[in-house]
Amino acid sequence: MKKMIDYSVYLVLDPELCGGLDGMLRVTEAAMAGGAGVVQLRAPQWKKRQWLDAARALQPLCRQGGAVFVVNDQVDVALAVGADGVHVGQQDLPVAVVRELMGPQALIGLSVNHAGQLAAVPSEADYLGLGPVFATSTKKDAAPVLGLAQLAGLAAATSLPTVGIGGIAPANAGAVFAAGVDGVAVVSAICTAADPAAVTRELYALKGHTA
């Protein structure tokens, strides 16, 4: 499964921006129609039961739409619903522990902000989220902004698939792809769009695809 993943447009769902669970389901369905290959549930303010209810609804929807479903940080929720993977940050559970819990077939992503973190990436990681590329308001505890030059340096220094994240929208996604990443992780530009499918399709086309 992991060999077939298209990271080009990686949707990160924010319940506040999407308008709750119903909005997240609507946005997910539209984004998959536009070419999104990975969908991540990220809801740091939520209680565990809310995570579980949302993941239970999103997992079959993503499977039906052909997208990989990833849960941010909450390994227990991912296991409970049979999610495809988990994405963790530098202060979350270690990747090796996540791999042990999730098993060999799970997709595991890790956030990276600088060369020191990149050098310490464990072998159990499958892909890296590099960022924030630009300033973002969707992550309150975001690390320092990378910019395109540092993004390119990090992407060139790893053999793992990479996804740029942080402040990415159609207006700047072309430059992010040009920096050498395999995909763009997008939150507000898709979640708040009047036509999420059209925005996703536009982002997808910037990498030279058609959906």
From Swiss-Prot:
4-amino-2-methyl-5-(diphosphooxymethyl)pyrimidine binds at Q40, L41, R42, N72, S111, K139. It catalyses: 2-[(2R,5Z)-2-carboxy-4-methylthiazol-5(2H)-ylidene]ethyl phosphate + 4-amino-2-methyl-5-(diphosphooxymethyl)pyrimidine + 2 H(+) = thiamine phosphate + CO2 + diphosphate; 2-(2-carboxy-4-methylthiazol-5-yl)ethyl phosphate + 4-amino-2-methyl-5-(diphosphooxymethyl)pyrimidine + 2 H(+) = thiamine phosphate + CO2 + diphosphate; 4-methyl-5-(2-phosphooxyethyl)-thiazole + 4-amino-2-methyl-5-(diphosphooxymethyl)pyrimidine + H(+) = thiamine phosphate + diphosphate. GO terms for cellular component: cytoplasm. 2-[(2R,5Z)-2-carboxy-4-methylthiazol-5(2H)-ylidene]ethyl phosphate binds at T136, S137, T138, G167, V187, S188. The keyword Magnesium applies. It holds the Pfam family TMP-TENI. Mg(2+) binds at D73, D92. Keywords: Magnesium, Metal-binding, Thiamine biosynthesis, Transferase. CDD domains: TMP_TenI. Gene3D superfamilies: Aldolase class I (3.20.20.70). Belongs to the thiamine-phosphate synthase family. Condenses 4-methyl-5-(beta-hydroxyethyl)thiazole monophosphate (THZ-P) and 2-methyl-4-amino-5-hydroxymethyl pyrimidine pyrophosphate (HMP-PP) to form thiamine monophosphate (TMP). This is Thiamine-phosphate synthase. It comes from Laribacter hongkongensis (strain HLHK9).
